C-alpha cells in the first residue's frame, strides 16, 4: 500500500500557491489574469 501523496501544509501552500508568489512572476500574473477573466471567486489559494 502506497502512502497518500497529499500531505497538507499551510506554510508550503502559501509559499508556492499564494497571491504574492503568483504576482512575483510574469507567468504567475498570467494565472491571476486568466482566473479573473474566468470569474473565479478565489484567484490564488
Curated annotation (Swiss-Prot):
It comes from the Bacteria. One of its GO terms (biological process) is translation. It comes from Nitratidesulfovibrio vulgaris (strain DSM 19637 / Miyazaki F) (Desulfovibrio vulgaris). Belongs to the bacterial ribosomal protein bL34 family. One of its GO terms (molecular function) is structural constituent of ribosome. The lineage of its organism: Bacteria, Pseudomonadati, Thermodesulfobacteriota, Desulfovibrionia, Desulfovibrionales. The keyword Manganese does not apply. It holds the Pfam family Ribosomal_L34. Coiled coil: none annotated. Keywords: Ribonucleoprotein, Ribosomal protein. GO terms for cellular component: ribonucleoprotein complex; ribosome. This is Large ribosomal subunit protein bL34.
